[in-house]
Amino acid sequence: MADSPMPDSPIPAPRSALPPLRVLLAGPRGFCAGVDRAIRIVEEALRRHGAPVYVRHEIVHNRTVVEALERQGAVFVEEVAEVPEGAPVVFSAHGVPKSVPAEAVARGISWLDATCPLVSKVHREAERHSAAGRHILMIGHAGHPEVIGTMGQLAPGAMTLVQTAEEARTVMPDSANGLAFITQTTLSVDDTAEVVAILRSRFPDIRGPKSEDICYATTNRQAAVKAIAAESDLVIVIGSANSSNSQRLREVAERAGTRAVLLPTAVALEWSLLSGVTRLGISAGASAPELLVDQLLERLREHYALDVSERRVVEEDVVFKLPAPLA
C-alpha cells in the first residue's frame, strides 16, 4: 500500500495544547460617531452620484477604511485643484480651511462637508472669540489636518499654536484685547489639562470652553485604555500611524506603566512582541473599524487559547445626522 501524501502544512495543534492568553478588550473602542458619519457621507454620495466621487484628504486616518471606499469608487486627492470640473468632492472629517470650499465654489464644483460636528463646534468657538476681539491660543499638533482646518477659519495671525506644556510656559501672545483658548479634539486628556492649567495660571482672564474641546470619543477611549493597562503586560492599539487619537491611546497605556504598540492591521503583528505576555490588552482608535480587532483575535487564536473579556467604562449612544443635502 502506498504511503499517504504528506500534508502541505503542519496540522494545527489541538486547542488544549495551545498556551493560554488572557485578552482584555477596552470598551469603548473603534469608530466614533464623527467617523461613522464621514464614511456614510462618502457612501451616500457614491450611491446618489455614482463613481467617481472625489474626497479631499483621507476621509479618516485609516488605510483599511480608505481602501474599502476606493473599491466602491471614491478617489482621494490632496487638493481641490485635482478634482475635475463637474465632479462632486467630499471634505474629510478633520475639517478644512475656509479657503478650500471657496476654491471649490470658484471652480463650480459641488461639495459635501464631512467635518465632524465636534470639530465644527470648535470652528464656531474660534469665530466667536475672534468677533469679540480676542487672540486665540490653539492647543494642538502642528501639521495635523484638524489644526490646519481650524486655524484656517480665521485670518493669519488670529491664532497662535501651543503644542506642549513648555510652549504654554513661554508663549507671549498679544493680549491687549483679551485671550481665549481652543483645543484639537483628539489630544491626550491629561496633557491638555496640564497645558490649560499653565495658561490659566499665566493668564487668569483667558476665556475657554466650559470643558476642553477634546471629544467624548477620545476621552472615553483613553479612559478605557487606562482601565485595561493596569491588568495587561502589553497593550495593542489598532490604528494608523497618522491617526492622532490612536497614537494618544498608545501613549496613555505607556504612561500607565504598560508596554504598548500601535498596529495598523493584524498582519503587522510580530509574534516576538508577545514573548512573556500572559495578559494582553486590546483597543482601537476612533477611526479603526471593529473588523480589525476581530481579525487580530482570529490571528491570536492560531497560537493561543484565548480567554477574552471586555472592560467597558461607558456606553456610547451618540449619532450624528448626515448633512442636509444627503439627509
Q: Locations of the language-model features?
A:
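The feature marks the mature, well-folded catalytic cores of soluble enzymes
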Residues: A2-D3, P7-A286, E290-A327
